Amino acid sequence: CAQGLSLHLGKRQIIDNVSVALRGGEMTALIGPNGAGKSTLLRLLTGYLTPDSGTRHLAGKPLEAWSPEALSRRRAVMLQRTALQADWTVETVIAMGRSPWGATADPAVLAAVMAVTGCDGLAGRRYPGLSGGEQQRVQLARCLAQLWRDGAPQGWLFLDEPTSALDLYYQQHLL
């Protein structure tokens, strides 16, 4: 997936010659102390940041060669902090994951991802009024909706601190 990634921010070396191999069907976790660069590495791997050096590939193709539309159909990203303040319903936020953005979401897909993430009980509620853990589950459902094909998510799911606001029940049952 990536070889020799390096990134400087100002004079500070954030990522130094990191290589990562990710395989389909596997779950990989990055573990380290706060400030170690895990979130930055995730942003490099997903194309949100451009490295100073190194190469990145998704499904054998250089990340830079993917169009934004094609990339959004193959990988979904849940960032650590989501700054969504829009007064939308839970269903609207989840449907935002469909590609292209604004495409009509299949009601069966919405129902499936809402059930998988425990968001079915949040139907009709407004996103800003949700707790942090509920918002986190909605964001996970949005990512799953983005990748949902043929009854299951198909593609690469990149999650940054996906359980940080979840209670113990959802921490154990979602991932």
Regions found by a protein language model. Give the residues of each.
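The feature captures the beta-strand-to-loop junction immediately N-terminal to the Walker
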Residues: I31-P33
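Catalytic Walker B motif of ABC-type/P-loop ATPase nucleotide-binding domains
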Residues: A152-E161
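Conserved ABC ATPase "signature" region
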Residues: P107-L122
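Conserved ABC transporter NBD signature motif
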Residues: L22, G54-P62
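ABC ATPase NBD coupling module
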Residues: P62-A76
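Helix-to-loop junction immediately C-terminal to a conserved catalytic motif
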Residues: T46
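Conserved ABC ATPase signature
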Residues: R126-L130, E134-Q135
